[in-house]
Amino acid sequence: MEEFKKNFGFGFMRLPMQEKEVDIAETCRMVDAFLEAGFTYFDTAHGYLEGKSELALKECLTSRYPRDRYTLTNKLTNFYFKKEEDIRPLFESQLAACGVEYFDYYLMHVQSAEIFKHFKSCRTYETAFALKEEGKVRHVAFPSTTERRCWSRS
């Protein structure tokens, strides 16, 4: 069961809603139950619930629990930046929205051959690893849905 607890996550992509707003009380109850059961991994992205996911995560998790109680993943998605200079301000806004000083995992989200070209032209990977060097990201990661062909050297 311990191995399962290490590998089971709480995704903030879909949360209980009241009208068009996150039901904060219910989400907090869910977060509390998740942590009480021994789970620690939380996942969000800037675009989830039109940005409300990160804010709900801050309200229900990061403002209520010490940083060592959870592992947090966020993602960098291609349609939120057009050039290299857009990445850091986006990243800093993600940290602020989530209420943390660093992310445990920062995923290069939805990698395909086309998106890989965009990430590469914007020096996204270099920026992500620089953020890691600065201690703002513990691990840079790539989703397992990544197309193999976009990583070939040809």
Residue ranges and their predicted role:
Residues 5-9, 40-41, 69-75, 102-107, ...:
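Structural preference for beta-strand elements that scaffold enzyme active sites
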Residues 18, 32, 82-154:
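Glycine/proline-rich, positively charged
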Residues 48, 64-88, 109-110:
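Structural motif corresponding to the early beta-alpha repeats
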Residues 1-70, 127, 133:
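N-terminal binding-site loop/beta-alpha segment at the start of enzyme catalytic domains
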Residues 19, 46-48, 76, 143-146:
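Structured beta->alpha junctions
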